[in-house]
């Protein structure tokens, strides 16, 4: 795997992460479609994810939490808006409160695109924020480093599936 680039665009209110993998597009798609594979890489190594619901269809929803080094378990949700298997999906990604309900605030819109390459697949994650303040807040929370750490785990998951 090669993390090609991470780019923040304050004018467009986006953060784009591009990575390439030595695996076919269907295999990379399964990293998103299979909740057991997804939870093996979604989140940095020190904050593993547990998906309690994962309905990857338009109008579907995913619920998850991450477990931190001190046992804290912040929750998150995805509202699935578009699915074009095996090349594209769009989710609204937000935090949940302690009861598991969507927390106040605008979710981040995350678009995932997968493109076939000779001998592999390019994955592009484009996160679009509601405001510059939201983008800044997520950067301060470590989103950029967290995504890089998460993506670094993908090769191991792909190797086991091969």
Q: Can you say where each PLM-predicted feature lies in the sequence?
A:
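A short, structured loop/turn motif at beta-sheet edges
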Residues: 25-26, 56-57, 81-88, 113-122
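Short beta-edge strand/loop motif at the mouth of beta-sheet-based domains
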Residues: 16, 36-75
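Beta-strand/loop substructures that line and gate deep hydrophobic ligand-binding cavities in soluble
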Residues: 18, 92, 99-145
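Hydrophobic/aromatic beta-strand elements that line small-molecule binding cavities or substrate pockets
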Residues: 19, 51-54, 76-82, 107-115
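Hydrophobic ligand-binding cavity/cleft-lining segments
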Residues: 1-48
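Hydrophobic pocket/interface hotspot
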Residues: 28, 38, 62-64, 80, ...
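Short, highly charged C-terminal tails/helix-capping segments
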Residues: 51, 158-162
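A generic structural micro-feature
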Residues: 9-11, 56, 70-74, 102-106, ...
